[in-house]
Amino acid sequence: VYACYADWGIKLKKAWQQYRRLVVVSAFGGVCALVLAGWLMFVLKPDSACGRLFMWKIACRAVAEQPLLGYGMGGFAAAYGNAQEAYFATGDYELWEERVAGSPEYAFNEYLQTAVELGGPLTLCLLAVVLFCLYIGIKNKRFGICGAVFSLMIFSFSSYPLQLPVFVVTAVCLLLACILRNYRWEWMGLVILAGGIGATRLKNDLCMEQACRNWMNARIFYNAAAYGSVEKEYRLLYPLLKKRAAFLFEYGHILHKQQKPEESIRILMEAMKYSSDPMILNIIGKNHQQTGDYLAAERWLIRSTYRLPGRIYPLSLIHI
């Protein structure tokens, strides 16, 4: 964006005409510096880098399984868990992949996450809208706003900013700012829109914050294994926190410890919609053990070993 603002294109043409050899050497040196910087960053934390690449590989496999419609909003974790489970079940993988595999909630790449949840066509449409807004913004010489959008796009390539409401509101406002004309009423409308969305989110977040506070208080008893005392608290919090995987897992685990396998399985099946954690499969397997259905228990525990082969806990349960 700054290059457009500073007319770097014209300056580079002049430099190419006058100092071709210097331009070639400088370009080669810049490429070498970027490659060296990338290699140094990889060497600094190789497992982290390999884990990120493996995560993207599994996310691509999830997209390939359902490329058109995706798995729905919030469906990334479940889709990722199933795709990783299917990948390791084939047995055709490298040892380093087993070492770096995990149970992520996000893809650490907003483009892949959107493709998994919404499908490829809608992802391309959204990207086209963003590029169109950038084109209009650069044409209107709003380089600062376009630079902010570019920064968010680069950030989105290796993280998950759009999973946080504040970044979603920021992105929408920046894109609208790219295409708005210089009429005061349009900018006032943008301010009112941003304020309205923020106020709505704040109201919802305040209710959720209080529920989470109550959950944290109840979790003290959960961590102390006082399952009988805390079951009622979790039941009361369930309507507000029924889309939080960690809460659902704890609630299902409490029901398992209270010898209520059917209820526990129902809650844990809901947790699987929002999480790829193999511990959910382990507890479901143990619930089937409680009911005497050992074949079903074995199936769930074997699925857990495929989801994260590096874990030995489900193997120990199978041999009990």
Describe the role of every protein-language-model region.
Residues 73-116:
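Interfacial juxtamembrane loops and adjacent helix segments
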